């Protein structure tokens, strides 16, 4: 059996491949794991794509998850295309809709023992670029569900957009994988700490990308309530 350490995430994550070429992911567990597994099972039953299936627990107490083939992004050196951003936001909407009837009562999540509020659903809570899976530049799924727990869908969307949309023209963003990116920016390494003064250059195209992402993630009946 071949194994490969996967950097990032919560640490201690390995991809193992058996003699038949089947890849699996081994990850450390915690007190929140049963609640996360129940969520993933619910999403699978609802037919949501782009979610790793839970395959069990190994003899060392690690969870065994389906491996989602593709590549992940490093926000410091990678960028996603506008098309991938819109697809990710659309997937986020489908996820929230699939999770809406998952009401586990008071459950232990990574954030502590919590119960869903009336206006809450179980959110991913960490849908940044680094947890996207891309195939040929296209959004294909979301990984690292350890921080899932009660929240508001708008907060998941805000996190996704904060991670995926450039905040100002001075950000030096790399060439996106798989398509165009708004606003256009020179190839290089991004540095969010340099975003001390906003620039209006590129705002129109950036706003359009953000609007497409918001529309993809927001049910039509709620769009009229979106500011602006």
Language-model segments: which ranges?
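Active-site acidic catalytic loop and adjacent metal/ATP-binding pocket
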Residues: 12-18, 54, 112-156
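Active-site activation/catalytic loop segments of kinase-like enzymes and analogous catalytic loops
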Residues: 157-189, 205-213
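ATP/Mg2+ or Mg2+-diphosphate-binding catalytic cores
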Residues: 208-228
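Protein kinase-like catalytic domain
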Residues: 44, 96-100, 165
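ATP-binding glycine-rich loop module of kinase domains
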Residues: 2-41, 66, 72-77
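Conserved kinase catalytic-core helix
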Residues: 75-108, 120-125, 130-135, 185
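Conserved HxN/HPN-centered segment at the entrance to the catalytic loop
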Residues: 44-57
């Amino acid at each position: 059996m071949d194994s490969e350490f996967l950097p990032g995430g919560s640490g201690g994550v390995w991809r193992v491949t058996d003699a038949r070429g089947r890849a699996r992911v081994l990850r450390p567990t915690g007190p929140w794991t049963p609640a996360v597994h129940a969520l993933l099972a619910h999403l699978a039953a609802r037919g949501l794509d782009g979610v790793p299936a839970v395959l069990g627990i190994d003899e060392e107490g690690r969870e065994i998850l389906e491996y989602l083939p593709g590549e992940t992004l490093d926000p410091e050196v990678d960028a996603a295309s506008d098309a991938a951003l819109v697809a990710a936001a659309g997937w986020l909407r489908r996820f929230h809709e699939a999770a809406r009837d998952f009401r586990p009562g008071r459950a232990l999540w990574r954030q502590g023992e919590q119960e869903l509020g009336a206006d809450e659903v179980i959110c991913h809570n960490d849908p940044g670029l680094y947890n996207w899976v891309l195939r040929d530049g296209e959004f294909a799924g979301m990984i690292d569900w350890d921080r899932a727990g009660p929240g508001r869908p708008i907060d998941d969307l805000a996190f996704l957009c904060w991670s995926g949309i450039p905040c100002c023209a001075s950000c030096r963003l790399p060439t996106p994988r798989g398509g165009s990116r708004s606003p256009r920016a020179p190839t290089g390494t991004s540095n969010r700490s340099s975003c001390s003064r906003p620039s209006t250059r590129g705002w129109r195209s950036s706003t359009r990308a953000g609007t497409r992402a918001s529309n993809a993630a927001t049910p039509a009946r709620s769009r009229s309530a979106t500011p602006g």
